[in-house]
Amino acid sequence: MSKVLQCCQLSKSYIQGDIETKVLNDLELSVDKGELLAVVGSSGCGKSTFLHLAGALDSPSSGKVLINNIDIHQLSDKERAKFRNEHIGFIYQFHHLMMEFNAQENVAMPLMIRGEKPKDALLAAKEMLDQVGLSHRIDYRPSQLSGGERQRVAIARALVTKPSLVLADEPTGNLDSDTAEQIYQLIRSLNKTAQTSFVIVTHDLVLANRMDRQVKLVQGQLRPLSDNSEQALPPTSSITDPANNIKDNEPQANERHV
């Protein structure tokens, strides 16, 4: 089976003054086409750093990241931005939708950034919103949508470019259990339909154990998650929101622009 993502001896260190902190240490990973991979780990273990490197948002101290056999960190900044747009989708715990645009316009944005005609981009966005069950909400702005609906818009935006790899950071972490289940079923359905690979960072081991494979980030390296009886890990403070457990039928009207 073809490999969508390969991390080879991937290391990342941060230096502050005379202190060097090694976050990732010769990390190795291989993700197959169409695979659903869960990454878990304790707070501050480097999961966000890993996602940034895998998504070409940051550069490693050493090692390689290959997506579809392309060494993404050998590309120029312009080439890397183009590659991200064409091959990688991103889903976050907080949707990061543009509040001044409606759902269809938000989903169409990556295609318009790519240079596609607005008419074609909006049509593709409409079709994608239909796939995630939101064709009746295309004219709604984020402030008019519930938490679950906004996350579905974010998923549609991540997939509208037909990426081979989607990187998701706590995609259900800010949702109640019923809405989280809907999002999981949506991800599983889209994964099956398009054979898109997903790498999902989560603290929820119940969700993680429903993926095809689970790994745990420990001491800068990824290891198989062998103990499926573990309880959910505590959330990372930097991504924890006080308005947790947003219900799917509760619109959030007072969101800030992002």
Swiss-Prot record:
Residues 222-258 are annotated as: Disordered. Its EC number is 7.6.2.-. GO terms for cellular component: plasma membrane. Keywords: ATP-binding, Cell inner membrane, Cell membrane, Membrane, Nucleotide-binding, Translocase, Transport. GO terms for biological process: lipoprotein localization to outer membrane; protein localization to outer membrane. ATP binds at residues 41-48. Residues 226-243 have a biased composition (Polar residues). It is found in: Cell inner membrane. Belongs to the ABC transporter superfamily. Lipoprotein translocase (TC 3.A.1.125) family. This is Lipoprotein-releasing system ATP-binding protein LolD. It comes from Colwellia psychrerythraea (strain 34H / ATCC BAA-681). The lineage of its organism: Bacteria, Pseudomonadati, Pseudomonadota, Gammaproteobacteria, Alteromonadales.
